[in-house]
């Protein structure tokens, strides 16, 4: 039955850090709370875990109310049947891998030793650490320590998995591998999961659904592909990936940029004459061509001037002054500051934000 959160509120002093947040997580679904520091995502997670006392709203896990301030309900963390992986691994340095994983079952006191040993073997096999059961944390890599924390979170067959920025202490390459491992394990076990991060790549690659948060409220939620390609809010477009924005006005026939350049985009994105909107252009859909190149009819072209550049290895990142705005584009072609260029893109790659987004 997953997780149900309705009108969750958390207040610290005079600050409302979580303000009427509502969402559901279905069985087997992986939902990410994504947002900048201070947006309320970790506080929301801690309320789900029972580590914070909510000031309003309700939280249900597997159909059972675990938090409802109006009814005086606050079920303790140890009674919520959840597993949690923290930003810091939080594993005991004096215990072996097996002992760390067994610890949650041992403190419950009601599980026979043989059953604990079997559960530990199962959890370590799931995370691929069964051969390292007798090692101590000091003998493990950072990625292996994080897998110990994950094994400990799943050993009790929890109803819910919670992740509080678990990859932030890993290097980039190890982060990618561990990200894939967490996704595999969560899907294999079909446990509803809530994952907190400020990292857009983690949110997009791991999630069935992403909830974008800012200043304690939900800005927008949806499937990763939809939020990236067709966001309904400017904040989402800015926060998820690199985006360029162009002011557009509909003249009755075509959309025009601030300098009058025509941008002929699909009819379903048209509006009434005089309406002003913003167009979102992702860096990767833009091509940078010399100004004298003959253009095909499949692409829209805007004339611009290179104002800055940074060599990034696979590509060069160009800052190009176009239509009274500066846009960022990636290209393997070589230009210098001051070059006149054409920035080209396909009509279907333009996304017009709704009015007042």
Model-predicted regions and their roles:
Residues 81-83, 87, 91-235:
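ABC ATPase nucleotide-binding domains
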Residues 34-36:
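The feature captures the beta-strand-to-loop junction immediately N-terminal to the Walker
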């Amino acid at each position: 039955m997953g997780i149900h959160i309705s009108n969750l509120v958390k207040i610290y002093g005079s600050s409302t850090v979580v303000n009427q947040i509502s969402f559901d997580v279905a069985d087997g679904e992986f939902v990410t709370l994504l947002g900048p520091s201070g947006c309320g995502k970790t506080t929301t997670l801690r309320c789900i875990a029972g580590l914070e006392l909510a000031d309003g709203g309700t939280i249900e896990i597997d159909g059972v109310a675990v938090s409802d301030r109006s009814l005086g309900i606050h079920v303790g963390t140890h009674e919520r049947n959840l597993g949690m992986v923290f930003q810091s691994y939080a594993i005991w340095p004096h215990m072996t891998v097996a002992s760390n994983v067994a610890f949650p079952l041992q403190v419950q006191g009601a599980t026979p030793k043989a059953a604990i040993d079997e559960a530990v073997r199962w959890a370590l096999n799931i995370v691929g650490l069964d051969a390292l059961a007798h090692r101590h944390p000091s003998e493990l890599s950072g990625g292996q320590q994080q897998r110990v924390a994950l094994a400990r979170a799943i050993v009790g067959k929890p109803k819910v998995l919670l992740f509080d920025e678990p990859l932030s202490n890993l290097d980039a390459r190890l982060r990618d591998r561990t990200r894939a491992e967490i996704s595999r394990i969560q899907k294999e076990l079909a446990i509803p999961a809530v994952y907190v991060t400020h990292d857009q790549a983690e949110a997009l690659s791991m999630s069935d659904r992403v909830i974008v948060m800012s200043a304690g409220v939900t800005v927008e939620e949806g499937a990763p592909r939809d939020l990236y390609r067709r966001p309904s809010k400017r904040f989402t477009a800015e926060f998820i990936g690199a985006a360029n924005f162009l002011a557009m006005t509909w003249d009755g026939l075509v959309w025009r940029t601030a300098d009058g350049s025509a941008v002929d985009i699909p009819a379903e994105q048209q509006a009434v004459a005089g309406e002003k909107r913003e167009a979102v252009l992702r860096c990767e859909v833009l091509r940078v061509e010399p100004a004298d190149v003959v253009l095909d009819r499949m692409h829209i072209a805007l004339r611009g001037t290179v104002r800055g550049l940074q060599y990034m290895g696979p590509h060069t990142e160009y800052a190009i002054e176009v239509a009274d705005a500066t846009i960022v584009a990636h290209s393997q072609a070589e230009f210098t500051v001051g070059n006149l260029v054409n920035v080209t893109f396909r009509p279907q790659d333009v996304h017009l934000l709704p009015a007042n987004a």
